[in-house]
Amino acid sequence: MKPLILSCSQASNKNELDNKYGKYHILNSASLKDGKADAIVKFKNTAKLTEIYNTWLTSFDKETVLVLAHDDVLIRDEQWVEKLEQGLKKYDVVGLAGGINAKITAPCLWHIMCPREDLRGRVSHVVEGSNGSETYVTDFGKQGRVLILDGLFLAFKIKTLLSAEVWFDQTNPCVAHFYDIDFSLTCNKKQLKLGTIPIDAVHNSPGLKKYTDDWLAGQAWFLQKFIDGKY
């Protein structure tokens, strides 16, 4: 069964994605035109990712491999479907970047909580001011098993999560923050293996620019959950 990319976007349609991100967005990813993979974007989305993702877990065949990806991610690796298939033979959930040995403390960003030498994976980014003409690679470290995966790309077989009774926690107050860290730690608690695989993808985002009220509320929620021993 071919993988299914699922993404949420505030844009109204593909034209808006083109205008906002140029060519670097999820619907321009490799393997879509040749039918090796499918993609669905929930446009005009204002709901929390945790709510949408949980709905999707029960909306498709249990054998389906879901790829939950940000709308500003372009998968340009022509062999990503094959690499994903191999990666899911080794790990229960795969991603592009993450880390191990996290020290849970504020600020709760995975690449800060994990020591530099314990980061894994690689992701390309668009050079700011280049109008999309240039990209560069952020090489976090060698590929391998991780404790936490970045939410820009999370892939798994639906039945793996359902069998382990893993869901996205909808008590998370954020629209699009902390769901990935919480999900990753929940997977680990349920004995699922997470790891990064070498898929060439571009994330057309500069990352978190400031700690918004939404983000700070999510951090407080996450830290309390950690203090309460939920992981």
Tell me what each language-model feature is.
Residues 42-49, 74:
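Short, acidic/glycine-rich phosphate-metal binding loop used to engage nucleotide
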Residues 54-65:
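Active-site nucleotide-sugar/metal-binding loop of Leloir-type enzymes
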Residues 63-74:
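Short beta-strand-to-loop acidic/aromatic patch adjacent to the donor-nucleotide binding site
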Residues 73-86:
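Acidic donor-binding/catalytic loop of UDP-sugar-dependent glycosyltransferases
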Residues 83-165:
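Conserved catalytic core of nucleotide-sugar-dependent glycosyltransferases
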